[in-house]
Amino acid sequence: LALKVDWKFDYLLDAATKLEKEIINDSLAYKIFISQEDLNFYQLITGRFSDCTVWPFRPKLPNISLEQPKSISKLIWFGGIDTHKKKSIDWFVNKVLPKIQQSISEIEFHLWGRRTEMYNNPSRKIFGHGFWVMEGFPCVEGALYVNPDIIGGGVKLKLFSLIEEGIPFVSTVFGFEGYDKKMIDNSMRIVTDTEHFAEAIISRLQMGYYNNV
């Protein structure tokens, strides 16, 4: 994807990398990882097995009633536009969304969060609303949430709430880091690579929307 990020993100990434190295090399520290892949990598590079464990994110899954589907008319991004997130949203708006709208012309893309107004472009059916001031999530019914993360680097806590609320979403592999892959069901929780992101969303839109109970 030929990504470039600004100096702020580079600075934070460098600081986090140095801290991670300090923790890994500390023989008195007990390491807790958020995914089995991270744990396996640590054990591979260090040869240590007794000073580490994994605590994966396991939200409580709601009961889903697969009743008569309703059509989905909106894609939703819920989150601020920080420097590294902007790269992901730019990629989605410029590369992914046109493919989706070419297949399903009536679909709209709505963004809520800090600095999302910069994307407001009604002529392209893109609506940047700014901060969401209400409780819960915007436009839950008749909407599909998207998490087009192309950088990764941490657990996306909003996914935790989407999972527990039974709100359908499509995420990149990077955006699902730290979560148990057993939760992926290809209906309410879809995870795919960047190459097939548009196709996964189109397929999910054609499935319709299912109510949760």
Predicted regions and their residues:
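Membrane-proximal helix-turn-helix segments that form the acceptor-binding/catalytic region
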Residues: 2-31
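Acidic donor-binding loop of glycosyltransferase active sites
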Residues: 139-154, 165-167
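Short hydrophobic beta-strand element within catalytic cores of glycosyltransferases
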Residues: 158-161, 168-174
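Conserved catalytic-core segment of nucleotide-activated headgroup transferases in glycan assembly
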Residues: 44, 54-140, 191
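Short acidic/histidine- and often glycine-rich active-site loop of Leloir-type glycosyltransferases
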Residues: 173-188
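Helix-loop-beta element that forms the nucleotide-linked donor phosphate-binding surface
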Residues: 23-31, 39-59
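Conserved acidic donor-binding segment of nucleotide-sugar-dependent glycosyltransferases
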Residues: 187-195, 203-209
